[in-house]
Amino acid sequence: VTELFSEEGGGKTSIVYQLIGQCQKMGGIAILVETEDALDPVRAQTFGADLESVVLIEPDNMEDALDQMGTAIDSLPKDAGPILLAWDSLAATPTKKELEAGLVGGGAIADRARLLSRACRVLGNIVSGSRVAMLIVNQTRTKMGVMFGDPTTTPGGQGVKFLSSLRLKISGGKAHKGDHGDHLAKDVLIHAVKNRMGPPWRKCRVRLNYETGWDNEWTVLDFGKERDILKPRSRGKGAYDEVLAAMEWESDD
């Protein structure tokens, strides 16, 4: 289970589309729980994702989302290939009590945390026994009155944090514009604040091109420069074509 969180517009959905595309490329099944009301099939194709082949769940509330996720996983064939379950997003999924309470109701936040705490225990068993890679997309909130340390937090209580084997914090980096001031791409910083699969606190920088998707070549070259694998004598990608060829790098992977 991986939790992916950032502020609005951080690039989370672009990562979801990329993972769906890779899952489909491997012959797997992608399940998308969508509560953001922001599906964009054309945008998804940029990342190689075919939303028509996705098992789409559009629940009205969190209780329905959890029930339908369990049902979808149980209905999959036992010999199914890689299975991706992406929830976009947890923060945008209200509970029944939140919907009933309306704008001025109280007690809904605590009820949400308790519900998620129970649900995480169930989801953990379902995912671990079904060879499912689960991605939970979340948003950051600012804690009031924090004088020292990181003032940001994620909604949902501690349940998702404990359940996740990997927690990735996404933050924005440098924006890249064209000759006429058009936004062409941006750098995205990914910080592993929790990692049961390896050393924690590792960081990386990737580039998101708004027209072509994630720029894998640039990311590999930038990593090579930072680790002194490549000499930063030239800023152009073309200068490293021979290095990429020697690494047997394939841009589609």
Q: How should these model regions be labeled?
A:
Residues 1-54, 70-74:
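The Walker A/P-loop phosphate-binding site
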Residues 35-37, 59-61, 89-90, 139-140, ...:
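Short, ordered loop/turn segments at secondary-structure junctions
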Residues 60-132:
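Phosphate-binding/switch loop-helix module in NTP-utilizing enzymes
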Residues 92, 98, 142-147, 231-237:
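N-terminal cationic and glycine-rich segments that engage phosphates or anionic surfaces
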Residues 109-227:
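Phosphate-binding/switch region of NTP-binding enzymes
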Residues 232-253:
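Terminal-proximal interaction/regulatory segments of ATP-powered molecular machines
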